[in-house]
Amino acid sequence: MNPYLNFIQLAQGISQLEKFPLMTHLSKIILDHVALNERQSNPLSVRQLISIDAIASPATIHKHLSRLRKSGYVGVDENITDKRTKPLVLTPLGHQYIDALSKALQKSLKV
């Protein structure tokens, strides 16, 4: 079977696990942006995320970001000196979700 299709099937299964609150496709894209920037030690601010036109309109991004925060996937780093910016970071649940997807990708490549 195609490794990509295996991954898609495994990822859908992960998304349906009870410990991971449901996310929309757009929320997953936003979560990916937050995770990638955090990994590069350059966390996105709320303002930077909202300004990425390729994702959606600012209002739509803000709505989905609020859902991600309420669901516990994303938080704001409060341990910064400049209180004018609000860097977005993955929460432990966000890291667990990304780790589960990573394991699914590795598993799909072994088949």
Kindly give the residue locations of the regions a language model identified.
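A generic fold-level signal
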Residues: 2, 23-25, 82
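Short amphipathic alpha-helical interaction segments
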Residues: 55-70
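Amphipathic alpha-helical dimerization/coiled-coil segments
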Residues: 6, 14-15, 99-111
